């Protein structure tokens, strides 16, 4: 009888990388549908553009590296990166924003470090931060939810604004954003920060039109949709519970702590949970298996750190949302976290 010697791991998962990535995309669909419903067709256009650019860049880089582009494209990692970036930027951003972002994500943040499985930082978040710092106007030009607009942009107008800068009536995005009387175009998180800095109380801030019962109109349902998709990922065991639970716990804990010592000067935990990219970050971004911590205890520390940093950046930082910065800061700490949380060998 012949015996074969093989290296570990000897217990293998039945799911391939492509299977995992496909499930991530499927579970992100509820959030995409909610974003499209509340913020218009621009989200879908950005997504299709992002996927096309990401696939082209991935194939081009693999050819330059003299490797098969087909095998790289079959793992869907480039599509996931494109998806995360597309839903993170304003729906009516100029087309070149997502192109520049994906060049940084695919070429620099991913392949410069060796490709899939070698990148120390989340590629989509690297791209987002580069875009936010380089093009702050374009990256903060969010439209009000469709519910608050008299004439939402049609599919044709959205396409024209993204690729031409003007709609069918010859109006630019800036003209459209300033043409809605009484509605500020800031996101709920930005509106809260601006209002509190102006000396208003939290209760006064929440009387603005873009707020509803729990958080910002549209944003609360987008976060609930991503939460639903995240719970499906947990149910299917595509992701582990440690990072999302720890991140949300860190966000809630710091928000409660701030309200205890400075009541009325910071947003409530519910607003933080249902605003910005909280649920997208907790279930789809922070759980990136390549750039996240690899031990159970490390994942808890990693997730809690992200949640706490999100609150600190949202409350006192220079940007309205802090998910991308928090994730990248946590990525930097992963080697240290893993070093001090690695399981000890039995007997040592």
UniProtKB/Swiss-Prot annotation:
EC number: 7.-.-.-
Compartments in which it is found: Cell inner membrane
A Pfam short name: NQR2_RnfD_RnfE
Topology within the bilayer: Multi-pass membrane protein
Chain ranges on the Periplasmic side, renumbered to this chain: 92-94, 147-213, 264-265
Keyword entries, A-Z: Cell inner membrane, Cell membrane, Electron transport, Flavoprotein, FMN, Membrane, Phosphoprotein, Translocase, Transmembrane, Transmembrane helix, Transport
Cytoplasmic-side segments: 1-22, 65-71, 118-125, 235-242, 287-299, 342-348
Protein name: Ion-translocating oxidoreductase complex subunit D
């Amino acid at each position: 009888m012949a015996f074969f010697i093989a290296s570990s791991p000897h217990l293998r998962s039945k799911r391939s990388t492509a299977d995992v990535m496909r499930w991530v995309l499927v579970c992100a669909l509820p959030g995409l549908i909610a974003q499209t419903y509340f913020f218009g067709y621009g989200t879908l256009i950005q997504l299709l553009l992002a996927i096309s650019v990401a696939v082209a860049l991935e194939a081009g880089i693999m050819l330059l590296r003299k490797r098969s582009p087909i095998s790289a494209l079959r793992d869907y990692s480039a599509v996931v990166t494109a998806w995360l970036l597309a839903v993170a930027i304003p729906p009516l951003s100029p087309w070149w924003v997502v192109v520049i972002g994906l060049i940084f994500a695919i070429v620099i943040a991913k392949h410069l470090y060796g490709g899939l499985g070698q990148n120390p930082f989340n590629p989509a978040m690297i791209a987002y931060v580069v875009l936010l710092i380089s093009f702050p106007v374009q990256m903060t030009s969010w439209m009000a939810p469709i519910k608050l607009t008299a004439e939402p942009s049609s599919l044709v107008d959205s396409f024209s604004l993204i690729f031409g800068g003007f709609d069918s009536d010859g109006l630019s995005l800036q003209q459209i954003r300033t043409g809605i009387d009484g509605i500020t175009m800031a996101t709920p998180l930005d509106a809260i920060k601006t209002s509190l800095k102006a000396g208003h109380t939290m209760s006064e801030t929440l009387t603005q039109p873009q707020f509803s019962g729990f958080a910002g109109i549209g944003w609360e349902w987008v976060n609930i949709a991503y939460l639903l998709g995240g719970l499906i990922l947990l149910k299917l065991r595509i992701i582990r519970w440690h990072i999302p639970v720890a991140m949300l716990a860190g966000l809630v804990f710091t928000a409660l702590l701030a309200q205890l010592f400075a009541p009325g000067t910071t947003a409530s935990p519910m607003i933080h949970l249902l605003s910005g990219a909280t649920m997208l970050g907790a279930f789809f971004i922070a759980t990136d298996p390549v750039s996240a911590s690899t031990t159970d205890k490390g994942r808890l520390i990693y997730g809690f750190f992200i949640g706490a940093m999100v609150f600190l950046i949202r409350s006192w930082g220079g940007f309205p949302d802090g998910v991308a910065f928090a994730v990248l800061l946590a990525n930097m700490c992963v080697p240290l976290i893993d070093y001090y949380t690695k399981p000890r060998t039995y007997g040592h």
